[in-house]
Every structure is written in C-alpha cells, then in structure tokens.
C-alpha cells in the first residue's frame, strides 16, 4: 500500500483504516491471511525516514479482528495474531476488536469502524438489513473559535453570525 506517499497540501497523509479480518465464511480466507500477514510484517518493519531510521507510520490505521480462528486458542490463524501482538509491542498498532462482541451486539455482523474508532449508529434499510458500508460519517470537526472572536473584533452579534456560518458548513 502506498498511502504514505500521498500528501495533502498541508502535508497530511490520507486518513485510511485497514480492517484486518479473517472471516471463516470468506472463500479467499487463506489469500486474505497472506495479505494480512504481509501488512503486519511491513508495519513491524516500519517506514524509513529521510535520516534512514525506520519509524512507525500513522496511516493507514490497522484494526485487527480477533475471532475464534485467531484468538490464541489453537486456531488456524493464531500465528498471525502472534505477529500482530509483536507488531503492537513495537509499533503501537494494530488496534484490536472482538468479532464475538460485535456479533453479540449487531445480530451476527462484524464491520469496520470509520477512521480511527468512530462507529456509525446502527441503521437498517427498508428490508431490515444492517447497512454498514457506503454511509457517511462526518466525524470530528474543529472550529477555530479564537479566530472567529478576532474577526468579530469584540462585536458579539458578528461573533454569533460568523459562528453560525461556520457551523452551517459542518453539515
């Protein structure tokens, strides 16, 4: 993945999360396991910076799903979980999520959070099916209140007008 080679105009990398799940119902689970293993190996190694030092990249964020097949109880993919733990001990990531708990809370469904740790509130379509993908999550919005205050030049009415304008952009 080459997400870390992309930059915005202010020097930020795109906020991307990789949801690393080994689903027994996935017909390509073994191939998926190879991909998850390689992503973890690359993260464990780190990315070489300008000084030649391997550092921990902030993105993509990694979320590793613990399930019956990889929860260190003799499952087929326990070796990948051990790699994930090594990776976390050195690079702070991946974060972990329990498929068992998600299934309990969401009628058997397991799905990725958006961005860092933001979960959309549950929503079902007209057929009563959960819809987790393709939905928008605005997430966190920052407002620069000191800037609004400076622009208002002490005029409380102008402050509230500017604040209302900025808030309108948020949604």
List where the protein language model places each region.
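Conserved catalytic cores of very large enzyme subunits
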Residues: 1-171
């Amino acid at each position: 993945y080459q997400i870390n080679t992309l930059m915005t105009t202010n020097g930020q990398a795109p906020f991307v999360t990789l949801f690393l799940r080994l689903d027994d119902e996935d017909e390509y689970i073994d191939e998926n396991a190879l991909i998850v293993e390689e992503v973890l190996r690359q993260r464990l190694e780190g990315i070489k910076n300008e000084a030649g030092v391997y550092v921990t990249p902030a993105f993509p964020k990694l979320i590793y799903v613990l399930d019956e097949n990889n929860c260190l109880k003799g499952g087929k993919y326990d070796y990948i979980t051990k790699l994930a733990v090594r990776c976390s001990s050195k690079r702070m990531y991946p974060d972990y999520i329990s498929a068992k708990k998600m299934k309990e809370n969401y009628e058997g469904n397991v799905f990725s959070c958006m961005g860092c740790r933001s979960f959309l509130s549950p929503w079902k379509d007209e057929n009563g099916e959960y819809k987790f993908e393709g939905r928008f999550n605005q997430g966190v919005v920052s407002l620069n209140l000191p800037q609004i205050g400076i622009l208002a030049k002490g005029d409380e009415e102008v402050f509230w007008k500017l604040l209302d304008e900025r808030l309108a952009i948020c949604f």
